[in-house]
């Protein structure tokens, strides 16, 4: 009896890019080729991950698809075919219709994409312009719940500045999928999210793909995330595509040497096993710290209510050691850093550095003591003054806290610290915008190291960096610790990454430390259910 086969469904290409070339005109009116003969396609209901370092051309490729390039960018040649139409030849009116109904994009920095003077309800309503107002409120709430915002009824009344970074990104995702587009472009959508929320968002994208038959162009530098959801991997380097293969093949046997180096960098492990012991002279000792924020009250005579951002937290950190604070957005981990730096009001408790309670310090004594503890922020570009040259940025703190040092000594110290962080002397005369993300973070590290602090607070210092650059920055921090015996307080939502460089760890949830101890003990034998949930949500490369 002959075998009768059912009809085979042929997956059509929803997007085809052919030989796309793009130039950027610099200030001296010279053209620089940034996209060089880019060609790839995306099939119906397919997830394609576009991978590469900063400056490789990933985001420019995405912006070319939706024609939102800056005026300095010019597409010199090539085609972008979407639903059998060449996007590059469409009038702007037609393009606006496509952006509204057929192609949506989630941007990496949600704060720049959300309107600061509109509440979340009004912003999501814009995505539903053509829909009836009947049950619209409930649909908005359901949409927010689907992206992991459980208290959606409260969130729709808030403004962007009242949300954490992860919450803002979830709102952006809710807006992007509101009209059920045929193609969703996601530019680093999970970079700022905690592992549990990241898993929810990835699961959601896969679910939407199947439910709506939607295609996704997923731009990321996290190979583990890409392996979780991708059907195909496209690797970019210096404006060119160096590899285009099925996900399983890519993660098992990549063809290009650059792809192989990315996979090696993603498996970061440069842990130094310190002998952990108690000390009579800890660098940092936090006892029963409480930081409460008063909630906004719109009713007369209603008693005040407080958000317990940090509730009875205790941490001890010894010289030359690294302690990690891990938790989701809103867990209170960054509030601890703010409290140490004097940027958050403390309700009760003590923070001692070098056996001195800094909570009680005021005026010049506080200023003079500040050189002993410094902080590296999550976004190096925002923390560097764009109008100052790098040399002035790095030496500013030294000149302020040590006014007795002469110019010759400052120049010598400046030269030494540049060597220490791996930057050349020519960098001193440049401005922050002339550097990559990894280089800017090195500048931020140099700015604090020049003061020779005993304690460095690192608030998500690598979360916005590519895997190779991330590895370089972490290598740098580990090497500096080995040479100087500096102590690190690392704040992160990436428990897998932080486990490779920390000696001890505290897990935070809703303002409280739910588990604390040696990193190896927590990673191998966690006791708390919340810790187990975090560990189970960590993405691993699927081969």
PLM features: residue spans?
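A short, proline-enriched helix->beta-strand linker immediately N-terminal to the Walker B motif
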Residues: 178-182, 450-454
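Conserved ABC ATPase "signature" region
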Residues: 137-154, 408-426, 536
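A short, surface-exposed alpha-helical micro-motif characterized by mixed small hydrophobic
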Residues: 226-228, 498-500
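ABC ATPase NBD coupling module
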Residues: 87-104, 130, 248-254, 299-304, ...
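Conserved ABC transporter NBD signature motif
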Residues: 74-86, 349-357
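ABC ATPase "signature
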Residues: 244-245, 253, 516-517
């Amino acid at each position: 009896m002959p075998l009768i086969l059912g009809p085979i469904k042929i997956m059509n290409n929803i997007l085809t890019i052919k030989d796309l070339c793009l130039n950027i005109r610099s200030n001296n009116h010279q053209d620089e080729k940034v996209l060089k003969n880019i060609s790839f396609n995306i099939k119906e209901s397919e997830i394609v991950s576009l991978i590469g370092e900063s400056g490789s051309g990933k985001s420019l490729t995405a912006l070319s698809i939706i024609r939102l390039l800056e005026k300095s960018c010019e597409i010199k040649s090539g085609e972008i075919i979407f639903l059998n139409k060449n996007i590059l030849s469409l009038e702007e009116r037609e393009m606006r219709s496509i952006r509204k109904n057929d192609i949506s994009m989630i941007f990496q920095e949600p704060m720049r994409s959300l309107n600061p003077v509109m509440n979340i309800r009004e912003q999501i309503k814009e995505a539903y312009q053509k829909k009836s107002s009947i049950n619209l409120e409930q649909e908005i709430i359901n949409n927010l719940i689907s992206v992991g915002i459980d208290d959606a009824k409260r969130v729709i009344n808030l403004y962007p500045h009242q949300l954490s970074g992860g919450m803002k990104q979830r709102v952006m995702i809710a807006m992007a999928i509101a009209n059920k587009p045929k193609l969703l472009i996601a530019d680093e959508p999970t970079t700022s999210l905690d592992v549990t929320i990241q898993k929810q968002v990835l699961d959601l994208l896969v679910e939407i793909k199947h439910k709506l038959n939607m295609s996704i162009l997923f731009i990321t530098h996290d190979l583990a995330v890409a392996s979780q959801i991708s059907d195909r991997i496209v690797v970019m380097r210096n404006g060119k595509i160096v590899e285009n293969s099925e996900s399983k093949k890519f993660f098992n046997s990549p063809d290009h040497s650059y792809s192989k180096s990315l996979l090696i960098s993603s498996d970061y492990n440069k842990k130094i096993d310190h002998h952990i012991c108690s000390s009579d002279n800890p660098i940092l000792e936090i006892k029963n710290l409480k930081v409460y924020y008063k909630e906004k009250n719109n009713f007369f005579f209603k008693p005040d209510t407080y958000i317990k951002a940090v509730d009875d937290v205790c941490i001890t950190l010894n010289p030359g050691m690294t302690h990690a604070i891990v938790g989701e957005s809103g867990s209170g981990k960054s509030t601890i850093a703010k409290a140490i730096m004097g940027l958050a009001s403390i309700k009760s408790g003590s923070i001692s550095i070098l056996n001195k309670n800094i909570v009680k310090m005021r005026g010049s004594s506080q200023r003079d003591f500040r050189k002993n503890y410094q902080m590296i922020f999550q976004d190096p570009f925002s923390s560097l003054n764009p109008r100052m040259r790098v040399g002035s940025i790095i030496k500013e703190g030294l000149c302020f806290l040590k006014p007795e040092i002469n110019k010759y000594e400052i120049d010598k110290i400046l030269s030494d610290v540049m060597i220490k962080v791996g930057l050349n002397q020519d960098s001193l005369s440049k401005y922050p915008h002339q550097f990559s993300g990894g280089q800017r973070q090195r500048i931020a590290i140099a700015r604090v190291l020049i003061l020779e602090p005993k304690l460095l607070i690192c608030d998500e210092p690598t979360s916005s960096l590519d895997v190779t650059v991330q590895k370089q920055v972490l290598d740098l921090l580990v090497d500096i610790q080995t040479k100087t015996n500096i102590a690190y307080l690392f704040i992160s939502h990436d428990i897998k990454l932080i486990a490779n460089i920390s000696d001890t760890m505290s897990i935070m949830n809703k303002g409280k430390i739910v588990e604390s101890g040696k990193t190896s003990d927590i990673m191998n034998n966690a006791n708390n259910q919340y810790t187990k949930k975090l560990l189970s949500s960590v993405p691993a490369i699927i081969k």
